Amino acid sequence: MPGKLLSSRCLTFVAGLAGALLARSAVTAQEVSPAAAKFLGAAGCASAMCHGGAGERRGQHAIWSKLDFHTRAHATLTSTRSQRFADTLKLGNPAESARCTVCHHPFQSVPAEKKAATVGQFEGVSCESCHGAAESWLRFHTRADITHADRVNAGMRDLKNLHVRAGTCVACHQNLDPDLRAAGHPELIFELDGQSVAQPKHWRETNVWSGPQAWLVGQAVALREMTWQLEREPAAKKTETDRQQALRWMLEKTSGQNAPDATLQTWSDQLARTVAGKAGSAAATRAQLAALVATSADFKNAAIPQPLQARRAERLVLGLDRLLATLKLEKKSAPSVKLDQLFKDVQSLPDFDPARFAAHLAEFEQALKELKPAQP
């Protein structure tokens, strides 16, 4: 339906929740096939013997329920601000409108026959929104003799795969319908690593370099989604085109590749798959950081319009933040102080000064070069 891009894209995501068409596992021999599995609700994950107990392996539900922003996703729709958006768009109650609940309370868009009675009325974005309908794998997924492949075959979404993880999250964290933007909905910027850290994480990463890897996969998937939307919005505002082209620029710098105009969506998705298929490493992170800090000359190019430069800088500083985090520097270290200045430079995009930013970026690059060799 024209003009309903968020709904169409995200309803595809919800449909995926309602029918994960994955192969049945011969090892687990579950009684319910993944395609027929129902959603059980967060309560099904909360027992002390599962994810509601104490300790690193059993405290996930407590972290999610007490600290994760997703638990408050539905509550956001009850605010005066949300009602103002809904009034502008004549949606009625935002807490009940599918235009809003598709991302803030996805269970509302799942057919009743796919939900067990244990599903909470106002769960927001809960366990199965990301992990998939649990009826076909809940009872056995914590058993020691069950492999990750067994769980995935039984219907659990493979969130260890960063490409799959990014695709699960991006549907509600990047694109907006034009009318929602016009009504005042906050702009969305997808940052897989940064937003995962802010949740905070209720899972363990086995690779200490997975953060930069997740960041890059997330950026590539974000470009894929932005390109998808712009192909369906021929009359998109210049702002959206600038955002897409800024992200494209950053990914070209990071990857060392030239992104083709004709196949940009395919290119960005393939980049995400390629990066997700390789283990993150110190060498890869250093190379990415070096490539991005060496872009100060780009911001001295007077032929590039200021709004596009501002959008480039906006994406760049977020990326530098995620990559610099791996160095575990003190807040008073020279690179950290210089990065703080770069963030200040992009606080007001209309007032962004490319030349000033270029100078500060060069200072940041020099501060990194002066780090002691013992530091990563």
Residue ranges and their predicted role:
Residues 2-14:
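Bacterial N-terminal signal peptides that target proteins for export
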Residues 29-48, 52:
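Short N-terminal segments immediately surrounding and downstream of signal-peptide cleavage
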Residues 45-47, 100, 127, 169:
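Short cysteine-rich clusters marking metal-coordination/redox-active sites
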Residues 12-24:
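Bacterial N-terminal signal peptides
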Residues 31, 54-88, 112-125, 133-317:
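Primarily the internal scaffold of c-type cytochrome electron-transfer domains
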Residues 38-46, 96, 123, 165:
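Short metal-coordination and nucleic-acid-contact micro-motifs, chiefly zinc-binding Cys/His arrays
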Residues 269-376:
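Extended, amphipathic alpha-helical scaffolds
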Residues 93-125:
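Post-signal peptide N-terminal segment of secreted/secretory-pathway proteins
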